[in-house]
Amino acid sequence: MAKKKFERTKPHLNIGTIGHVDHGKTTLTAAITKWLAKKGLAEFRAFDSIDNAPEEKERGVTINISHVEYQTDKRHYAHVDCPGHADYIKNMISGAAHMDGTILVVAASDGPMPQTREHILLARQVQVPSIVVFLNKVDLVDDPELLDLVELELRELLNEYEFPGDDIPIIRGSALKALESENPDDPDVKQIYALMDAVDAYIPEPERDLDKPFLMPVGDVFTISGRGTVVTGRIDRGIIKTGDEVEIVGVRPTQKTVCTGVEMFRKTLDEGRAGDDVGLLLRGIKREDVERGQVVAKPGSITPHTKFMAQVYVLTKEEGGRHTPFFTGYRPQFYFRTTDVTGVAKLAEGVEMVMPGDNVEMEVTLITPIAMEEQLRFAIREGGRTVGAGVVSKVIE
C-alpha cells in the first residue's frame, strides 16, 4: 500500500514537557491530546500509551521519550514527553535538544523542586529558545496567595537562568481534572486550551536553517526488510531530497551513500527539512555500518575531529555538579548531539585546577572523532550525571 503523504499546510514546531518527576508532565501531554482530539486536531493518547516503555511501568516514572503528534488551529506540533527523573538526564539532554520551545510543568503543591531547576538549567544549556509554564495541581492548593508566591518564585528562577521570567506566560490548571473531565466548558479544560493558545502565541516559529548544508544527527538505526537501513533523527539544518548524496561522518571513517527515501510520521515526503523528525533510507548501508553519535550530512560540509578548544561552565554542587575541583588529565564523557564520548581535558597554562562554578577555556582530546565545527555545544558528564556544559570555540585537529 502506498503511504499517505504528509501535508505541510501549517508551520511545524517541536515542543515538549519538562519538569520535576511526578509533577504531571505525562498527564498534561495526555490531556492536551484528549482536548485537541475533540476538535479533530489530534489523536487521543492515554497516559499509559505515552508512559509506555516496559521497564518504567512499575514505578510510574517515565524513562524513555515519547513522541506525540497534534495540531492547533495555527500550527502542527511534534511533542516529546521528557523524563523528569535525574537518573534519566541522558534522555533529557537528547530530548531537550529536540525542542523549539518547551512547557515547564510545575506542581503548585510542591513549587519548584531540584529537577525543576536542573531542567531549566539544561534548557538554557541546550538553548531551548522559549519556555511556557503550566502551574499544575492548583486544585490541591486552597490559598490563592500561595499560588501567587509559587508563581513569583518560578519567575525569579527563570530569570536566574537568563530566561525572561517576567514575560513568560504561566497558565494555572489541573491536568488530571482536565483529563478526567468530559465537559468542554469545564474550567480545567478551558485551561488546556489557554495553555495551547499561549504556546501558539509565545513560542516563536523557529528560524529554520534551510539554507545551510544538510545535517542530521543519527538518533536510531534499524532495518526494514526488503528496503534497507533507515536512520532516524531530527534534521539539524538544510534539506534532504530523495536521490541526494550524503556522507556519514564521525566515530568511524567517513562513508558516502545516497538517500533513497525520506519519511515522517510513517508518511513519505518529497524532502525533509531542518526541524523535521525523519527516517532516511540509505542505499547499500548495513545496520552495523551506522550508529548513534554519527551524523548524516551533505558531502564535504562537516569533518570529524578529536581535538578542540572549548569554553566550559562547570556546574556547582548545588546545581548537581561535582563537589571537588578537577585538574589537567580529567577524563569525563563529552555528550555531543546524541552520544557520550570519553575525552581528556587539558587546562590552560598557569591554571592549576577548575572549581565547581568556574567558567574556563580548556583543550579537549576525544578518544573517537566526532563531526564537529565551531559553536557546537556539548554536556560534560560523569557516570550519567551532568557536571558541566560547553561549546567548541576552536577546532584543532
Curated annotation (Swiss-Prot):
Mg(2+) binds at residue 26. Residues 10-207 form the tr-type G domain. GO terms for cellular component: cytosol. GTP binds at residues 19-26, 81-85, 136-139. Residues 136-139 are annotated as: G4. It is found in: Cytoplasm. Residues 81-84 are annotated as: G3. Monomer. This is Elongation factor Tu. It comes from Syntrophus aciditrophicus (strain SB).
